[in-house]
Amino acid sequence: MNYTVKFQNVTKKYKMYNKPSDKLKDLFRKQEDGVFHYALSNVSFEVPKGEIVGIIGLNGSGKSTLSNLIAGVTMPNKGKIDIKGSAALIAISSGLNGQLSGIENIELKGLMMGLTKEKVKEIIPQIIEFADIGKFINQPVKTYSSGMKARLGFAISVNINPDVLVIDEALSVGDQTFTNKCLKKMNEFKEKGKTIFFISHSLNQVNSFCTKAIWLYYGQVREYGDVNDVVANYRAFLKEYNQMSMEDRKKFQEEQVLQFQHGLLQDYAKETLTNPRRLKGERRKYKKKNRVILGISLALMAGIISVGVYYKDIFPIKQDTQHVKQAVQGEDTNEAKQDKRQRVEENMYMVKSNGINIRKEASASSEKLAVANFGDIITIFDDNKSKEKDAEWIQVSLSKGEIGWVSTKFIEPFKSNDSIIEDAKLADITALLKRVYGENMASAPTYFGKTLNELKATYPQPLNPLPSMAGKTIVKDGNIQFGILQDKVVEVVFQDISMSIAKLHELLGKESLSNDVEKNYFYETKSYYIAARSDQTHREIQSISIVKK
């Protein structure tokens, strides 16, 4: 068959580590052993030249992994991929260096794709005209919005003229005018017989533009064929899926993960599992390697301690006796404060996931009172519990004296720990957002404690009211949302910010708590709770909630 792209039994998995030191230990272990995330499993298909293939599926089904494999960004662990010609990936900020300007990124990406310097200079005016981002073309890409990154990435990729074009959600962040321009350019590629992979959650765009479709389902190809048939079947599945409650969805997802061997799995070599003697030998080797690692670690620690003692003798540390005396005098007061805080924290729980319903009764079919997201802190009501089938529910206090019920599967006891960061870290976040989204981002936290009338009177832009959430009054201006409780601003949420997870960790450091599956991160400062929530479609932090303690 005259194909352009061919996948044969392709599997892609990622090794999971709990902490950075595990990567060092992995040097002494068998690479086949450990916990892996299976993004794709045994995927096979062929795409003829000139086809436009839509890739659809739920979040986390492997769409972006598939696009990276086609574009050669990553390599498969098993199976074979055959691409005839060059492939270019268009995704939000894909292949763009945030420290370089737009012009410099054009030159760099062109050279990386094998173009000569003369050819790059020739296409630069076309790329600038298509991207249409004005004076920002000479600014660092890190100052761009998501839409501007998508514009530049799309303009570069289509003007490099690849044989295979992979578009991963790049049209989801632009305005309608730019989207129409992109679709027109894609139709030109279509007429030239180019092969295009179009990844999108917009089924209408997929249906109208594509000739075929691949439905990815928990890392496997559930259906591949005519776009009308595949999209129709996927729509029917979505209709049934969207009618499920959040609790039913969680249960359904767990069942499908087990059935399709998708997600986090423990890997062992088959020969080892089927041979008890071999398994015993592997365990002995593993213990021996652990002893070697332990010996090296102890030697390093001894060396560090020796150096520390040596320099301590050379540079004696002065003791602040006055500070010690004050600490002793205030010990009783601090203990009383800690006891009081502990009693409060015993009733505090944190929500572990996004979109969790708080219901009127202890039942998944009961009326929904509110929706809680990862990082929300809730207070239980007298530790009242109830069981419904296999689910346990606990009674929680809402605002304005309301009482609701939430499944204990989605909450966990919350206690402050030693990972509290400085309040000043919040300024680093707002300073970064200010460069991209304007002055209002930096000033937003200054409105904590203001009444709704004071907020409206002092905020520089009109505030639009939204439906209340968990008893809180919600008002919004663009990317900034305020939550008002008991007529005081208690929460500020920055939305649609598209911040990389690496950048979040660079600014705030190690999180106190996290949901590694959903890529959500929780931080605590002296005065605030900070919840950074991701959108798995874009694999970036999309919102940051700041709550005053």
Curated annotation (Swiss-Prot):
Entry-linked SMART domains: AAA (SM00382)
Chain sites annotated for binding ATP: G57, L58, N59, G60, S61, G62, K63, S64
Cellular component GO terms, alphabetical: plasma membrane
EC number: 7.5.2.4
Compartments reported by the entry: Cell membrane
Gene Ontology MF annotations: ABC-type teichoic acid transporter activity; ATP binding; ATP hydrolysis activity
Keyword Membrane: yes
Enzyme class: translocase
SUPFAM superfamilies (UniProt xref): P-loop containing nucleoside triphosphate hydrolases
Domain ABC transporter: 22-243
Reaction(s) catalysed (UniProt annotation): ATP + H2O + teichoic acidSide 1 = ADP + phosphate + teichoic acidSide 2
Pfam family, one: ABC_tran
Region (Unknown) location: 244-549
InterPro entries according to UniProt: AAA+_ATPase, ABC_transporter-like_ATP-bd, ABC_transporter-like_CS, ABC_transpr_TagH-like, Bact_Polysacc_Export_ATP-bd, P-loop_NTPase, SH3-like_bac-type
Keywords: ATP-binding, Cell membrane, Membrane, Nucleotide-binding, Translocase, Transport
Limits of the SH3b domain: 346-415
Bilayer topology: Peripheral membrane protein
Similarity comment: Belongs to the ABC transporter superfamily. Teichoic acids exporter (TC 3.A.1.104.1) family.
Function recorded in the entry: Part of the ABC transporter complex TagGH involved in teichoic acids export. Responsible for energy coupling to the transport system.
NCBIfam families for the chain: PRK13545.1 (NF010065), PRK13546.1 (NF010066)
Oligomer status and interactors: The complex is composed of two ATP-binding proteins (TagH) and two transmembrane proteins (TagG).
Descriptive protein name: Teichoic acids export ATP-binding protein TagH
Provenance organism: Bacillus cereus (strain ZK / E33L)
